[in-house]
Amino acid sequence: MDVCARLALWLLWGLLLHHGQSLSQSHSEKATGSGANSEESTAAEFCRIDKPLCHSEDEKLSFDAVRSIHKLMDDDANGDVDVEESDEFLREDLNYHDPTVKHSTFHGEDKLISVEDLWKAWKSSEVYNWTVDEVVQWLITYVELPQYEETFRKLQLSGHAMPRLAVTNTTMTGTVLKMTDRSHRQKLQLKALDTVLFGPPLLTRHNHLKDFMLVVSIVIGVGGCWFAYIQNRYSKEHMKKMMKDLEGLHRAEQSLHDLQERLHKAQEEHRTVEVEKVHLEKKLRDEINLAKQEAQRLKELREGTENERSRQKYAEEELEQVREALRKAEKELESHSSWYAPEALQKWLQLTHEVEVQYYNIKKQNAEKQLLVAKEGAEKIKKKRNTLFGTFHVAHSSSLDDVDHKILTAKQALSEVTAALRERLHRWQQIEILCGFQIVNNPGIHSLVAALNIDPSWMGSTRPNPAHFIMTDDVDDMDEEIVSPLSMQSPSLQSSVRQRLTEPQHGLGSQRDLTHSDSESSLHMSDRQRLAPKPPQMIRAADEALSAMTSNGSHRLIEGAHPGSLVEKLPDSPALAKKALLALNHGLDKAHSLMELSSPALPSGSPHLDSSRSHSPSPPDPDTPSPAGDSRALQASRNTRIPHLAGKKAAAEEDNGSIGEETDSSPGRKKFPLKIFKKPLKK
């Protein structure tokens, strides 16, 4: 049974095997026949489309691949690929989300693409003419499969073989290219299909010139950004510096304004001092008038009384007043023995000062204009900075340097104006001290031109003084003290200034009273300056006469103090000799009165008395006060024996000391000037 079963199985297996072989042989014959038919149809179609290349086997394989691609895209198998079929193929098979660009590249103006159109498009493509090196470069850069480079070079695959890579061909990819990885085969197919249909990829179309231009553009952009950053920082620093300079100009302007206010205040105080001096001189003149009235009263009492003792007492008092007047005259002559500047020189110096002030004001106005220009430039830059591109525009323009230059120029001009103001004040103060009269305070340039008889056309047009002032920050460091010019004079000049400020008929004091004659009024000022007095000799001669009168009586006066010997001791100056003779004559007149009281028997025509009277002018009328009487009245005002006059004199001296003129009877004691501004103590 077993053997039979086995034999049956063997027979059955043999029958089945024979039947299978026969079936497979029939199928292979059919396939071979169909393949042969398809190959024949493909060759015929290829020869119809491109007859010159129909005998090339490689071109036939490429055409067959292109035909397979067209068949893959032609869903309805009508022989043409329309717009919808290509769009669907791009979206589904190639996975393009936005196939608009690819779609327009594939179709162009032809909406239906046939196999012939697709083959002609492939032949006209740049990829068709690629060499082996270009295909290898495409494989490395675009497909990113550099491990198959050697295989491609061995097979010498050029651009003509690109369609065979775009279709699914296991023999080509697996056997020929030896790609075992399925993902690599699929990736190569898709990239090749895209290249065949739409041309070379964009990555392979770049040129090095564009890359170089891109790099250069990036470098230029980075450099421009860095340059803009540097310029922005520089402009900010420059703006800070300019704003600092502008603030310095503001401080300088404020400092100059403060200095000008101090100067105006000093001038006002100086005018106040002058007014006080005028009031003081008026008060002194009133005291002199009271002293004259007192002397006149004493004289009337002496003349009107019949009591000899009263008359002798009054005469002694008058002699004491004469002695005191001579002493005061000595001091006044010593104080007036210095040089006096001519009065015309004061007007010329005042005119010179006003002309210099005009030029200073012109220079100061120019400095103010420069400051205003600098301020306007700074304001413009501030406004530009507030705009969108203001900082960049300011950084690349020359306005910053121009404004900086204007600020520095204005600052230098203000420094020059400050130095000129400082030097001018100091110089005119020294000139006022040396000359002994006022120059800065004057009636004005028009009054001076009229007083000096100058043609006004020579002076030109005057400029008004500006209302405000500017100054550099150097004024903050100015340590000079503004001192009243007349308060800095020497002791001899103070008395001369006081004499000039008084009225002509009262300002000369006892000197004019003692020298009241026609010949004295005709003397020129230069004669008085040239002839120096000798007060010690005059006082010494007068003292001898007075001592002789008071000690030995009238006879010893006639014998010991002869007028001839006294005249020999008088000074050489004619003017001062006249002064001394007038004072001495008055003393002799009083001695004669004593002689008449003490010795009535003495004849009035004594030769000694006549000789003494021959050296003096004729006595004045009783109703008219004589010059000697005026001298006695002037000196009696300063005599402390009158109580109420002494109190007024002390008050006047205190007022005089309060304005800075410290008077002292001793000519050797130094008089200190009044400082209107005191230097502030630095903390």
UniProtKB/Swiss-Prot annotation:
- The glycosylation sites annotated in the UniProt record are N129, N169
Q: Which residues cross the membrane?
A: 212-232
Topological region Cytoplasmic: 233-683
Query: For Ca(2+), which residues are the binding ones?
Result: D74, D76, N78, D80, E85
Could you tell me which SMART domains the record lists for this protein? SAM
Assembly state and interactors? Monomer in the presence of Ca(2+). It oligomerizes in absence of Ca(2+). Forms homooligomers and heterooligomers with STIM2. Interacts with pore-forming subunits of CRAC channels, ORAI1, ORAI2 and ORAI3; this interaction is potentiated upon Ca(2+) store depletion. Interacts (via the transmembrane region and the SOAR/CAD domain) with SPPL3; the interaction promotes the binding of STIM1 to ORAI1. Interacts with ORAI1. Interacts with MAPRE1; probably required for targeting to the growing microtubule plus ends.
Protein's recorded name: Stromal interaction molecule 1
The segment(s) forming the EF-hand domain are 62-95, 100-124
**What gene does the UniProt entry assign to this protein?**
STIM1
| Positions carrying Phosphothreonine | T502, T515, T663
